[in-house]
Amino acid sequence: MRSLIISLNFNPGHVSHMLASYKQCEDLGYESVYYVNKKFVPFLPQKSNLSLFGGDNCPKADLAIFLFPSEKNLPLIWKLKRKGTKIVYIFHEPLAPLSVYKNAGFSTKYLARLWVIDHISALTVKWSDMVLIPSHKAVKYYEENSLYKNKNYYYLPLMYSDEREQRHKQLLKKNFSYIGTVAADHSFQEFLEFVEWAVENNRLKAYNFLIATKSEFVVPDSLRNHHRVFIHKGQPMTDEEINRYYASSFAIWNAYARTTQSGVLAKSFMFGTPAIVLRKNMNEFTHDGANVVVIDNNQDKEQIVNALKRIADNIDSFSSECRKEFEKSFYYKVYNNLFRTI
């Protein structure tokens, strides 16, 4: 049996998800093959089975797993189904009501783009044999959206392989970090303003601040070349770079204005790193005082400081609980039997 792990739009943040599906299919007896945009090649494990998307190339397979939306998915699904391939779509982000995105600060232009992406996703959903949805909130949005016609859907949390190795455990957890895309709903500006304030007022003196993103942004003058601030911006990161950033953090910014299911949260738990989250975004994976600390206002700097102190004072306990949640909810092997049956 052969499985294709498919991601046609390049995003290095997708590698962890792809790796988990690749390994899971191998565990279940498939010959796994990455079928991807060529830009992924340097970011994928060496000696992996690999086939590059392009032209009329359409490999034969028993199973094809599409991990992310793309207009390129649609003709490929059509070709694969003609060959008898079973299509599975891991639907990370069913569209919330547009008012949710507007309230989070997205522009009208971006809302129009979301509308287009959603209609492409709806066709991918319709043509798939099975749809996997990663959170209770995502299931709710899926069930409320009349565009999503496929009734053969299942709740299955985001899956990861365990990428934490001994070298990661040895890193000092010294950073409060923002990791991921700069986006309005991720409240990046609030994080940046907090870091400026903390540096200028010499708060949290024992700790440093990290921003790791492929996005571009203007670095405030007060943070340029500051010894307490490390910034990686404007270029993709390898999976190993991303992993080191998580492993060297004692807390992760997840106090987003809006989130359906955060891959940042899951990956921070992989490395035993707790997160700061907004109360309104608490979900089935987060437990205040155990693997996250809840705040009510991501602009309240003293509230953020108190949350970080709570984590720092109990880091061993928080880290242990994060690992437990990762192993229970996000480790792909937990779902091997379920995936086999559905």
Q: Model-flagged regions — what are they?
A:
Residues 244-260, 273:
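Acidic donor-binding loop of glycosyltransferase active sites
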Residues 274-279:
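Short hydrophobic beta-strand element within catalytic cores of glycosyltransferases
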Residues 126-165:
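Donor nucleotide-sugar binding/catalytic pocket of nucleotide-sugar-dependent glycosyltransferases
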Residues 63-65, 80-104:
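Active-site proximal beta-strand in glycosyltransferases
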Residues 167-186, 192-195, 209:
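Conserved donor-binding/catalytic core segment of Leloir-type glycosyltransferases
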Residues 110-131:
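Membrane-proximal helix-turn-helix segments that form the acceptor-binding/catalytic region
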Residues 219-244, 289:
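Nucleotide-activated donor-binding/catalytic signature segment of Leloir-type glycosyltransferases, i.e.
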Residues 299-302, 312-342:
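A charged, aromatic-enriched C-terminal amphipathic alpha-helix characteristic of glycosyltransferases
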